[in-house]
Amino acid sequence: MERDDGGGGGLFFRGLQNRSHEKTKLRTRKSTLYLSPQKSTGRCGDLGENIYLVLFIIALRICNCFLVQTSFVPDEYWQSLEVAHRMVFNYGYLTWEWTERLRGYTYPLIFASIYKILHLLGKDSVHLLIWIPRLAQALLSAIADLRLYSLMKQLENQQVARWVFFCQLCSWFTWYCCTRTLTNTMETVLTIIALFYYPLEGSKSMNSVKYSSLVALAFIIRPTAVIPWIPLLFRHFWQEQRKLDLILHQFLPVGFVTLSLSLIIDRIFFGQWTLVQYNFLKFNVLQDLGSFYGSHPWHWYFSQGFPAVLGTHLPFFIHGCFLAPKRYRIFLVTVLWTLLVYSMLSHKEFRFIYPVLPFCMVFCGYSLNNLKTWKKPALSFLFLSNMLLALYTGLVHQRGTLDVMTNIQELSYNNTNVSSASVLMMMPCHSTPYYSHVHYPLPMRFLQCPPDLTGKTDYLVEADMFYLNPLKWLYMEFQNDSQLPTHLIMFSVLEEEISPFLISNNYERTAVFFHTHFPESRTGSHIYVYERKLKGKLNQR
């Protein structure tokens, strides 16, 4: 029996190890008596892993889903759930990206299908509309985790695979993102599963059609998903003996089918033929207009973004880069290439480099596998540091913008005067979800911020105009009392500045929600809900 160097894997991993060795014995004997893998190895169908491991990772990602109760970026609602809600229930807000056809309907269609099924079953409650899509994303992430583990078992051995698996599961950023309804999350899931079928030396699951289909699907969901795959595709093409056959009989048919599927889906919902992938790349890459939403120095990913995403895995990643076999250089090239390409774009975000995180976990796993004296302290350090950060960012930091939506839900469903209720969100645009988290056609308004596509030098969005002089904006916007909303939602930093308007129009604070310990200029530590008095009484709830 192989010695357990780490001691930190526990009975769970040792049980898996024993099963793996038992299978090796049977293979050596070439016995024909053991032809029932489901009985002898406890494998779970197409996933090809021990049933207990499958159940464990599914349970973990479900717990992960419910332990992430904070907001990250607006796109996880506005570019997925909000669009799906409009597709099924005929109300919901489409941002400017959809009028300009920069986004495709392929990804929202997944959630629209879920919404439609819930609607047909009469189970389309607001809570199910919020949580079922996230649980679906969690299950997809669990499948990706299993594929990464299976791949490393094929390429190396179970001992290396379990350390890569451990690093993947305890990564704070993976925990933070993998259950969110972001295109970046789906991009990462598809990248991992595609890597399982990619032709690597030692892989037993290589399949060019399957991996290229998954890459193509990732591309039509988020066109920049092709960036990490450029080095991998070139490597495959370079090493392939039948290059013409690879292109004509595999890549081109796969690309044609997936792109045609995307065109048909978008034709149905846009009402005209459009190639959203080209529009997306033109806006974000060729024209670099994403800088409207903020720009960073060229080195940001190397100096801040990548270290923050890796967190305490960073020293193990660096260590593993020196230890991993040469055949994994392509993974390192993929990571560096992706960072370099994204560094050339002005607008930078942590989530953009999420798809290369699994590649980094391979090197982190190698580092742990080669540690001897310090293995147990290293495991404890990695687990505790990542889980503390994961729980804080998942349960505490930036939770107010989701919590306040429960207040609006109550306003919609428990208010006898709901027909006269209305809401104005005086916050940076897209701070909160919208109708996907209310599921009622309540009149709501937020401060808009579409970018200038005409080239005006003095262009100001509504949100910027508001924050130049909030009090003046309110008095100019609501000169007639009949136009006043019944409810105002704002960050705490705004309250003092607009207090004359609140007092003169009989608004009273009715709810307070904690948001963050790190307030910024327009984002306060708390969110306030104000309700307008009518005839000496507060609006009834």
Swiss-Prot record:
Glycosylation sites (chain numbering): N18, N417
E.C. no: 2.4.1.-
UniProt keyword terms in alphabetical order: Endoplasmic reticulum, Glycoprotein, Glycosyltransferase, GPI-anchor biosynthesis, Membrane, Transferase, Transmembrane, Transmembrane helix
Keyword Transferase in annotation: yes
This protein's record includes keyword Glycoprotein: yes
Pfam families, sorted: Glyco_transf_22
Annotated protein name in UniProt: GPI alpha-1,2-mannosyltransferase 3
Organism of this sequence: Bos taurus (Bovine)
Gene that produces this protein: PIGB
